[in-house]
Amino acid sequence: MRSIPGTVGCVLALGLVACASEPSSNPGGAGSGAHGGASGTGTLGGTAGMTSAGAGGALGGSAGSSSVGGSSAGTTSPGGGAGAGAGSAGQPTAGTGGSTAGSSGGGSGGAAGAMGGAGSGNAGMAGGSGTMGGAGTGTSTLPAFVTSAANDYWNTTGKLEMVTAGTPTLTVDATAKHQPFVGFGGCFNEMGWDALSVLSADDVSKAMKLLFDAKDGANFLYGRLPMGASDYSMSWYTLDDTVGDYAMDDFSIARDKEKLIPYIKAALAVRPDIKLWASPWVVPSWMQSGSNMKNDAQTLGAHALYMARFVEEYAKEGLTLVAIHPQNEPGYARVHWTQAQFIDFIKTYLGPTFAERNIKAEIYCGTMSKDPDDTNIAKAAAMDADAMKYIKGFGVQWNLQAAVAGLAAKAPVWQTEHKCGNYNFSTPYWDQSRYSSSKPQNDHLYGEESWQLIRDWIVAGVNGYSAWNMVLDTIGMSLDRWPQNALLTVDRSAKKLIVTPAYYAFRHFSQYLQPNAILIDVKGSTDAIAFLNPDGSIVTEIYNKGAAASATTLQVGSTTYQFDVPSHGWATVLTPG
């Protein structure tokens, strides 16, 4: 593993990194800014220190059974700030609008705040002076322990014991710190909402909670969306097909209002602080010559305006874009960009256009997927001082893992698309027979592969991780006739929601992670990974690829825990620091 100089102890979200000591005029404020935190301290939070006094209990709160809002009588152990609602008794993590409240937490539910803490911040985990988390001294319910194995997913009844003798098989070293990790997310696509539309309203709500709820779901914080069609739209389209409309007079997101925006708003109903980012798969055909992006100034200027209008029109719908990646896979068949052209577009057209129109969405150099072509684009952009005036991060996926370390020295790096195919390829590519029902689209082996991929990318140095499709039907066929996987699937004929093994692989990583958790070392196995949360708690993830359950002892600080990790399964342990 490696460290990113200057990032530990800082707050990061997409391209914005602000250390706790830096005053900022960006959203903050004592529980009232867009991301909570101490007044005037940092872009996404306040000064470091999760246990300092202040309103909002990150590990306190009342002991009632209400998961959102309101106080509830509990036992009277000291502490527990005024959290935004009581968490469910005995639950180890922050629920939406609630602190981590256990049966022994004192205090009462208090003022609103989407993720706990005093005030009205959209995503304010803090009401006091904690970085992305509030103060509070109440007793928590840690440790927590969850396992998953084939046909036995998200088991919270496993045995976790504290032991005093023997040599631990795994040791967490919280002093060996690496990059901050801002969170997980997935992509909104039309086909996902179309699949969900066959379900009852209750099941649609269940799906959104499984993905975005911070207490009873995967705790996703980020959402990707296409700018125009993706290969998982219902059909190919762009947002301005009027030939020669360089002024974007006919630009429209009317199509997005049919499926895409309702999908996003259903998720926002569960988690109002979702951070949205976008990239185009296609551009208006009049901007292309064949499959190549035209390179004249008028066209490139119009394309920059096209992206600016996208951000502005979404804002009118109450949807804020935090980042734009200029192209999904620049070498992909729909739109080809040369290396020089892509970089010039950012520094000469897109960056200045966003600046002129006061657009706050960050520009990422992404999404890059093909080595060496896309690797070379990203590396060249990182070395271009004029481009880096506008580039706030990099988006990489598929086989660009080896490029992460070098890019991370320049700016934050996101893994932007989890490996998604069900691998049943045939020729020609549009042949539906490439999908084989004899090989499950989302089987447990794919879940195991997913866990390892997430681990490998994080160890490589990424600061965030995105799934591809969050929801598809059970066939999962793209417009390019390539069947792909999703975290949740819908059986259209049975009108049934199915939770896949890959979903649980993601949730093992994501549920207990707080924004800006720090990757730390685990000694004893490469199949274990750990994070230090801003509130001081530690999340350890373990994978057992063996054919039998693995007896494991884990040392965290001065405490050693003993438990079993199931065969071909995962375990998550949430402990005090």
Where are the regions that the model predicts?
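Positively charged n-region of N-terminal signal peptides that target proteins for export
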Residues: 1-4, 219
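Substrate-binding and catalytic surfaces of secreted/luminal carbohydrate-active proteins
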Residues: 140-172, 276-278, 305-322, 330-577
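A short, flexible beta-alpha/helix-coil linker loop
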Residues: 191-194, 328-333
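Short, conserved phosphate-binding/catalytic loop or strand-edge motifs used
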Residues: 284, 326-329
